[in-house]
Amino acid sequence: MKPTDFAKKLTDFLSKYLPCERGLSTNTIESYKTTFILFITFMEEKKNIAVNKLAIKNITKENIIAFLEWLQSERHCSTATRNVRLAALHSFFRYLQYEMPENLNEWQQILSIKAKKNIKKNVNYLTVDGIQLLLQQPDQSTKKGRRDLVMLSLMYDCAARVQEIIDLTPAMIRLTKPYTIKIIGKGNKPRIVPLMEKQVIHLKRYLVENKLLESHANFSPLFSNSRNEKFTRQGIANILQTYANAARVKDSTLIPKLSPHSLKHSKAMHLLQAGVNLVYIRDILGHESVLTTEIYARADSKQKREAIENAYVDVINKESPIWVGNDNLLDWLKNFK
C-alpha cells in the first residue's frame, strides 16, 4: 500500500529532522512521538479516519483544537500536558512550512493556536524534617535499601530531575576534592553541581559495593534495577512512593503527596530558606532563567512574612525511513527509538 503524505513527512520529521538537524535529545523526541500516537488515536476514534487513510489534508486547525480539547476532557490531561502536546505539533508544522509551502496558509493557521493559560500550582515540597524522615525509611542492612538511600539522597542533594538521575554514570562523579557531579539536563545541557562530603562517603561505599569504580563500569548506569537494567522514570517513582507511604505511617503531617520532582522542589526551597541567592539556585537547578527559579521565592509564605516583618515601619500610633507502510505507522511510532 502506498504511504500517505502524512506518514512520509512524520517519519522524516521524527527519524531525520529532529535528531539530525535539530539535535534534540532522545527524551524530547520520545515526547513528540507520544503526541503523534495520541493524535492518530484521536483521528481514528473521533474523526473515523484510519491510520492508513490519514493524510495532510485531514489536519486542520479545527481538528487540532478538537484534539487538544479531547486530551483534557476525555484523557484528563492537565493544561501543562496539553501545552506540551501543542508545542510538539507546532514544531511539526513549522517543519512543514518548508517541506510543503503550498499549504502555508493552513500551517500558519495551526501555528496561530495559542497555548492555554495555565494556573500555576503551589510548589509541593518537603520540610527538612520531612526529608529526614523520608530518608530514614530505606533498610540500610540490605543492598537494595543502600542503593535507594544513595539514589534518593543524591536526587535531593543535587536537585536533580528523575531523568537526570537515570542518565548518571560513574564517570560523571569527581571523588577528589572539590567533590562534584556532572548532570546532563534538558536539551543535553550539562551542569556541574557540588557534592557534600557526607554524601560522597555514602556514594563511595555504594560504588565500591557495586564494583562501579572499575574502569569498565565508567559509563554504566550509576543506578540499576533488580534486572541490572537502567531505571525507568516510573521505576524510581514507585520506589519513592514506597518510602513515602512508610514515612506517612510514622508522621503523615510531614509527607504530602510526592513525585520525584518534589525532591528537586524541596532542595530549592531549603536553599532559598538558607539565604542562598536565587542566581546560585538557578545554576544548581539547571534553569535557563532566574525567572523560572523565582517560583520558589513566591512559594515560601513563611519567608514572605519574615521579609515583611523585617521591613515594617510603625507609622500607626500604638492604639491601632524507517517506516514502510501505513498499516504499521502506529506500531512504528510505538517502537521508534
Spans of features found by a protein language model:
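Conserved catalytic core of the tyrosine transesterase superfamily
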Residues: 1-337
